[in-house]
Amino acid sequence: MDAQTDDKAQGKCPFVHAEHGRTNRDWWPKQPNLQILHQNSSLSNPMGEAFDYAKEFKSLDLNAVIADLKALMTDSQDWWPADFGHYGGLFIRMAWHSAGTYRIGDGRGGAGGGQQRFAPLNSWPDNVSLDKARRLLWPIKQKYGRKISWADLMILTGNVALESMGFKTFGFAGGRIDTWEPDQSAYWGAETTWLALSNDPNNKHSRYSGDRDLENPLAAVQMGLIYVNPEGPDGNPDPLAAARDIRETFARMAMNDEETVALIAGGHTFGKTHGAGPADHVGSEPEAAAVEQQGLGWKSSFGTGVGKDAITSGLEVIWTQTPIQWSNHYLENLFGFEWELTKSPAGAHQWRPKNGAGAGSVPDAFDPNKRHAPSMLTTDLALRADPAYEKIARRYLENPAEFADAFARAWFKLTHRDMGPRARYLGPLVPEEELIWQDPVPAVDHPLVDEADVVALKEKILSSGLTVAELVSTAWASASTFRGSDKRGGANGARILLAPQKDWAVNEPQKLDKVLKALEVIQADFNAALSGGKKISLADLIILAGGAAIEKAASEAGQKITVPFAPGRTDASQEQTDVHSFAPLEPPADGFRNDVPAKLAEISGHLLVDRAQLLTLTAPEMTVLIGGLRVLGANTGGSKHGVFTTRPGVLSNDFFTNLLDMGTEWKPAAEDGVYEGHDRKTKAVKWTATRVDLLFGSHAQLRALAEVYGCADAQTKFVTDFVAAWTKVMNADRFDLI
């Protein structure tokens, strides 16, 4: 009897993969996670590689969708009744929480991709009941199918909710393409329990250190929250302390004080919170719920579990007298009453007017015969306690039109911040106004260079005296700021000339200035000689120069290739560039240029993979780029670490052949994070390397890839693959080419 038959006889499951076993990540958690480089492949996408979402969205009758959404707002369902007979507040929260996971630190999170449908977001404590919101939307999604993504539909629904309650929104852009699996690249924190308190001695993975310094790139105060704890920091009902948390988390979402006040005051003009009873009545989140609940979670045993008995946050707050109508009542109430601390029926900290003021002024969500006093959250009172917030809030109170405009703009920014430039916006509701946070670039207003011009330019570039290393590193510095997460950065705009990028240490400002000045001379002379208004932008010239250098380096390796080049980039101005907003695009470390501070050396492999993921690279693409950039001399500061070749500037596969040479023995050097490669026989030092370099020989999967490029017959494949990966990075922000 074989083992599987024996297992059946004993009533055991013969399929061990059905049981919970430890993964490689469990056994070796310090190894870089290459899985994040292979997310959202065609293997997980049911729509197929030929699916063109932009084309489908353009064929959508958007007015019909909006009409259906407006009808849905007041079509209350018994299985999840609408507060005040209107789902507006619920759908605003759904859209807000879809977009509000965005953080400027790495551009991850946000509404793009519709990640609220998947773990962990679909089961975060802050997203209780949003499973019902999406289920209410299903008939509309089902009706319009592929023409509108879940990601777009959730944001559009939030807009329609606002419009249906009398508020004029700033606009709406489609173009968010659904993903079909959870995003494994986003770091949400190291805590192992939901809502772990930062001051809990049992929380060994607190996201805070020092004087409440929040770990980067996180933008929420606790695991499972979007921003802040509405009861105050760690549940402490201190409005001033809450203001500090609000300012930090909203700033990490790229919001300033005025936008923050507008969002909180505008959003809390509508709807209510839900805390009808104790939290122990609430069942498991969707990911842990029973299969018969069909993806719905948090089933409540308190009363009917819905409507007047609903428990979501545990808070029971109605802010205004007209919770389904736009008004200035939120600010009027905030400053019109003095507030005292109380508790919700669930025992959560909230606030009510002192001395019974305001009693009977606020409607009940379900009983027309019941009335209430208005109520507030600790985070609402923060807008009054913090001097800067108070000044802004009082100005909005006295100027309702300014408040409405500020909220409309802040809401648009909230819901579109991760979409990248306006070139990606789709639909008839896109606002005409160009906004600084969209990283605008000028439109192309001149004929572009042709093939003959490109050939002539390459000759001028290669005879300019600039080296292969200088040209390649400058092009890489320009293009590699791109982030696939929020579609920011990249070569278009030539912001490598502008603050803050021109001053980043990794870009070697003095060397960069030399290269750019030389290219500007070539640009000026060439444009002056052209006729018919034809021009080349500096943004294009930087990329063309990098390609010309690579062609030269490949030729010296005995291989003739042409690096693809597509003109069409333009040059942005400093006035079109928000210096503060661009600062987070500066990489803490750039393994591609072997620029890693000593304090980050231990995690340099993780940082490299993270950077590769933001550049939308696969593991093979990352590998071939490292090998090519090293031999081309693109290291910051001209460092020789990882330059495993005796012929730098030649596009050879020497990095891989020498890394994999068993005649070399590697040992730590005296300098932190640096290693020496000794000849096993003579003991002489042959090479020096960083942890990033050696990762391609030590990490089993990366070594397997390195072996492909280290073979005797791999030179042609290496050059071909390097050029393809290089071109992908150079064109990463060319949405006009898609």
Curated annotation (Swiss-Prot):
Lineage top rank: taxon: Bacteria
Cofactor note: Binds 1 heme b (iron(II)-protoporphyrin IX) group per dimer.
Active site: 97
Cross-link position per record: Tryptophyl-tyrosyl-methioninium (Trp-Tyr) (with M-253): 96-227
SUPFAM superfamilies: Heme-dependent peroxidases (SSF48113)
UniProt site positions, description: Transition state stabilizer: 93
This protein's GO CC annotations: cytosol
Region (Disordered): 352-371
Broadest EC class assigned to this enzyme: oxidoreductase
Processing and modification events after translation: Formation of the three residue Trp-Tyr-Met cross-link is important for the catalase, but not the peroxidase activity of the enzyme.
UniProt xrefs under PROSITE patterns: PEROXIDASE_1, PEROXIDASE_2, PEROXIDASE_4
One Gene Ontology biological process: cellular response to hydrogen peroxide
Family affiliation: Belongs to the peroxidase family. Peroxidase/catalase subfamily.
Protein function: Bifunctional enzyme with both catalase and broad-spectrum peroxidase activity.
Quaternary structure annotation from Swiss-Prot or TrEMBL: Homodimer or homotetramer.
Protein name from the UniProt record: Catalase-peroxidase
Gene: katG
